Amino acid sequence: MAAGKSGGSAGALFLKALDRSESKRDGGFKNNWSFDHEEESEGDADKDGANLLSVEDEDSEISKGKKLNRRSEIVATSSGDFILKTYVRRSKTDGFKTLKGNPIGLNMLSNNKKLSESTAGTALCSGTVVHGRRFHHAHSQTPGIRTAAQRKEYPPYVHKAENSPVMLSHGQGGDHIMKKTEESESYVESEIKRKVQQKRHCSTYQLSPLSPASKKCLTHLEVSEQREYCPKCGKEKENQTKCQSCGIVFHNDLQRNCRQAVTLNEPTGPLLRTSIHQNSGGQKSQNTGLTAKKFYGNSVDKIPIDILVTCDDSRHNYIQTNGKVILPGGKIPKLTNPKERKISVSDLNDPIILSSDDDDDDDDRTKRRESTSPKPADSACSSPVPSTGKVEAALNADACRAEQEPRSSPAEPELNTIVIPRKARMKDQLGNSISTPLKRRKVNSHAAFIHPMSLSCQNFESVILNCRSIRVGTLFRLLVEPVIFSLESITIHLDGPESDPVDIILNTSDLTKCEWCNVRKLPVVFLQAIPAVYQKLSMQLQMSKEDKVWNDCKGINRITSLEEQYIILIFQTGLDHQAEVVFESIITDIGIRNNVPNFFAKILFDEANSRLVACTRSYEESIKGNCAQKENKVKTVSFESKIQLRSKQELQFFDDDEEAGESHTIFIGPVEKLIVYPPPPAKGGISVTNEDLHCLSEGEFLNDVIIDFYLKYLVLEKLKKEDADRIHIFSSFFYKRLNQRERRNPETTNLSIQQKRHGRVKTWTRHVDIFEKDFIFVPLNEAAHWFLAVVCFPGLEKPKYEPNPHYHENAVMQKTPSAEDSCVSSASEMGACSQNSAAKPVIKKMLNRKHCLAVTDSSAAQEESEPCYRRNAYSVKCSMKKKNHAINENEEPSNGESTCQDICDRTQSENGLRDECFSSVHHPDALSKIRLNYGDQSADGGKLLEDELIDFSEDQDDPDDSSDDGLLADENYSSEIGQWHLKPTVCKQPCILLMDSLRGPSRSNVVKILREYLEVEWEVKKGSKRSFSKDVMKGSNPKVPQQNNFSDCGVYVLQYVESFFENPVLNFELPMNLMNWFPPPRMKTKREEIRNIILKLQESQSKDKKLLKDSLAETSLGDGAEQYASASGGSE
């Protein structure tokens, strides 16, 4: 009866607890069961899942040989008012059961439970049905498998501290849960302790009846423990398997639960992972002598890989293996056989420490990360699972995919493996990877193009190539349009200067020979044809013996002269490979069609050059035979004779001077440094190489290195100290950097364009104040053309007049008695009638000269209607000159010219300028056309951009004056320059002079940018604002000596700077004319002069280096001798 009553009261209490669990949000289906007071919070109940029962308790009960045959166990208290009844599910099989819910995917077991231990003898129930409901722990029926983390195999020196499970009881006074703490077990004396919080493993082991210690705790409601003693020494047991004092082994405990007692002290018998297959049903392990092979059965030999752990859908995090991140569904590296791998005690990983205490959450996470981080090992893959064995888990993030894919076996091809090449795994003696040099496949450009082109060249029946000239016998013509080569004909278009355009069509069937030279510096083709072709060309091109264009003294049918047997086509540039293949294919097909053997042939450069030289020599001899030719033909003869002479000297063929100037050669060879100027230890040295020296060859453009070098050489070598202190020369890169566009920068978004420009070059003047200088030289390069900008007197705010040191009062009184008064008079005091009356004789004199441009009365009227802001001194000088002409109107023109020439001669030594008023400078027609076109563009631009134009005078804006033939402006300027010595004062005003050797349109934008730079620089240096507008800082484009080719612009820039100090400008009133600043013949030797300077510096610097080396060698020898002498003396 008492048992029935107690059973009924226990059932009632259980139903009440069941009702409470159903009222919770999890519905009572969680795998943590706790029975507590009704006022307990849900959070506390959730934490009790790990504190309900301990597997250690059931171990103690199983060790006594008790077996559970009931589906439930009733634990009664001494008071009889509470009975704890625990329901567990039993599995139909003897395998293990996987525990879920662990956040790191590990199955935690109790202490001292090896994976090799079995649970034979415990039959798990399938569940318990109460009131129509089945109670279980929300786990599947699959057999449980304990992972390596559940083994809890600690090294001997590690203490293990366990938290005993919490025993629950129901007291009348509402007693709370009390914990029982077992004393920590230790293998060796060590300070390392591990705290393991146990969880319930009801699905893995059958819950046994409570141990006597547990019953005692529940009965007396106190924390106590039943102590056991060693049967041999009588001391208290601290370990259930071995006595710590005498070392005796407890055999009864070793055989409990039919587990094999495998200790870590045994070096043999490696700890193996569990198989992924469950043991055969009904097979049970023996109590003693259980080996790994018997425990796993044949599955160990068949399955060499670990289990594929399927992750929950909610845990699609990246899985780390061997320190690398593998995406979900990714392939896992190949796993090796665990039987072949052994591990020592020192290689064991630390187990994970779990605790339900909230205060230790952070520490647990840190330790968990440390324990899961793989150690460097020579295994193919390191698993994130901490274990003591050879852990090689093949992880797959996709659960569905893992279930569908069959498990791999050694017999199956390993498709999910990543194999590293053997060469990549090779290591040297030190264990480092062997880095083999990257071998690049050598690509033969010739072979790469020949194959595809040779297959498709039959599809090309014609090719258009650019040719620069043609020679037919002794006839030479330049070609403007390209030549068309086809299988049927060769079409050449000639545009004669005096005749109508002619189209020459050579039928390929009439050709007898084609010789081809495809050298980069001389690509040329020599064609030979039947005599009828020469006769046709002679008529078509109007060749005659009188003109000596084609001399066939021996008859057309008996052509023996070398120069008359070829039709020569000289190409613009060397053909690329594709064009060459097509061209040669067409010529080869022509020879096949004409059935001519050896029709196409390639010749060397020397042979091609000798043929061209022979053609030119023959032409010169034919010209010498006819001395009674017309004047224009004589010019042509002399023109061609120059070519012949150059060909003799250089053994190189050029068509004419223009072509020779345009033919640029490319520097080939190793680059070697010649000099550093100034040499060390001076700062700012410029290195000049042999490649830079190549730029000084005729026809080559000067580069920035030569420009910067020579400008620095002028300042340091040729200028006086006081002159060098008055100037500042910017680098040739200054303006480019000033005007360079940059990417958007958040720091400069609020700055203006002027400030952004200045910010790029603000450090260029950190050591100099440019406003204290008189002249600032800025070399500029735009569109591959060099020109010079000179900022004059940037520190002045207005024009400044100073006494003229070269003023001659006697000369002024003799020529113009009123000149002194007119120099100080204003524009309103000038007589307009005298200017009008003097203008006509001047124009008449200019019209009488055949080399001057026609000047109409409208131009004179334009001069008279100039704005009032024109400089007074210039107007006074013009009026003085015109008055002088009016006085001498009745005299002969020669007298007036001689008088002007005398004045110019007298002022030559004083001003450093020689002005020949009526000399004309001839330039090539092409340059004249370009300048005229630029002049027209500048005139149009002046109308459109009146506000942007710098303050250029009428001579720059007038198209006629922009050309070199505008001598009216030259004459006016010459009188101004020639009469500098007649003025008592000279003007110094802030201005920007642009000196261009190839005058074109006004470069107003350059002056504008320089003005804006000066404004910001003034604000930065002086701390105040100042305007550098066109009213304050005027811009002018003075007339300077002009180049007669297209490559000497840089040489002229250097000469402008040099002449600025050799023949200084005294008066800076605008406009100014410097056309005769230096003699033109000097420019022909300027390149050679700079070259010689560099070579001399190289020689001197090489000598200095040699002397320095010799001195160092002598010093080292002397030191060595002294050391030797001292050493020998000490030994004696």
Curated annotation (Swiss-Prot):
The modification Phosphothreonine is found at T436. GO terms for biological process: protein desumoylation; protein modification by small protein removal; protein sumoylation; proteolysis; regulation of kinetochore assembly; regulation of spindle assembly. The keyword Phosphoprotein applies. Disulfide bonds: none annotated. The keyword Phosphoprotein applies. The modification Phosphoserine is found at S41, S355, S356, S371, S373, S938, S1131. Residues 23-51, 327-388 are annotated as: Disordered. PROSITE patterns: ULP_PROTEASE (PS50600). GO terms for molecular function: SUMO-specific endopeptidase activity. Keywords: Hydrolase, Isopeptide bond, Nucleus, Phosphoprotein, Protease, Thiol protease, Ubl conjugation, Ubl conjugation pathway. There is a cross-link at K648 (Glycyl lysine isopeptide (Lys-Gly) (interchain with G-Cter in SUMO2)). It holds the Pfam family Peptidase_C48. GO terms for cellular component: nucleus; postsynaptic cytosol; presynaptic cytosol. It comes from the Eukaryota. InterPro entries: Papain-like_cys_pep_sf, Peptidase_C48_C, Sentrin-specific_protease. Its EC number is 3.4.22.-. The active site is at H785, D936, C1049. Pathway: Protein modification; protein sumoylation. Interacts with RXRA. Forms a complex with KAT5-TIP60 and UBE2I in response to UV irradiation. Interacts with RPA1 to maintain it in hyposumoylated state during S phase preventing DNA repair initiation. Belongs to the peptidase C48 family. PANTHER family: SENTRIN-SPECIFIC PROTEASE (PTHR46896), SENTRIN-SPECIFIC PROTEASE 6 (PTHR46896:SF1). Protease that deconjugates SUMO1, SUMO2 and SUMO3 from targeted proteins. Processes preferentially poly-SUMO2 and poly-SUMO3 chains, but does not efficiently process SUMO1, SUMO2 and SUMO3 precursors. Deconjugates SUMO1 from RXRA, leading to transcriptional activation. Involved in chromosome alignment and spindle assembly, by regulating the kinetochore CENPH-CENPI-CENPK complex. Desumoylates PML and CENPI, protecting them from degradation by the ubiquitin ligase RNF4, which targets polysumoylated proteins for proteasomal degradation. This is Sentrin-specific protease 6.
